[in-house]
Regions:
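Multi-pass alpha-helical transmembrane bundle typical of ion/small-solute transporters
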Residues: 2-137
Length: 137
């Protein structure tokens, strides 16, 4: 398909990406579930929170990674002269990989002793970063 001379609104697209990232960060924190059993003592509370440590670790890692990507994406758009259809489609593939992060983060946090669950999170990170790197080409 031949690229037309249509001028895509760079600011509008950047705002869309910002909104998607904000939603992803919100979904990410919603995966941190409050324990459902009754908290009958301080010891019980501490024990239940201790069980959430792997989920918090995976959440913090994903949050920091997405924050760094958001900052870099902003810098990328500051230097972008023209927004093309191909660039938009590549960005949307990047966003697709980014939107899976809440699932893979929660999965790895809940199944932190399962190497497959942790590997799935890191594969998600790698794919996401490859697609993000492709935006610079």
């Amino acid at each position: 398909m031949k690229e037309t001379n249509y001028n895509y609104d760079k600011k509008r697209f950047e705002t869309f990406i910002d909104a998607v990232i904000a939603i992803i960060l919100t979904i990410l924190v919603l995966e941190l579930k409050i324990p459902e059993s009754e908290l009958t003592s301080d010891l019980n509370t501490r024990q239940q929170l201790t069980h959430l440590i792997p989920s918090f670790v995976s959440y913090i890692g994903s949050f920091l990674l997405i924050t760094g990507i958001w900052i870099d994406h902003h810098l990328l758009f500051l230097n972008l002269n023209k927004l093309t259809r191909k660039y938009i489609l590549l960005n949307m593939l990047f966003v697709l990989s980014l939107s899976v992060v809440p699932f893979t983060t929660a999965f790895a946090g809940h199944h932190y002793l399962d190497s497959f669950a942790v590997a799935l999170l890191f594969v998600n990170y790698v794919i996401m970063n490859i697609l993000f790197g492709a935006l610079y080409w």
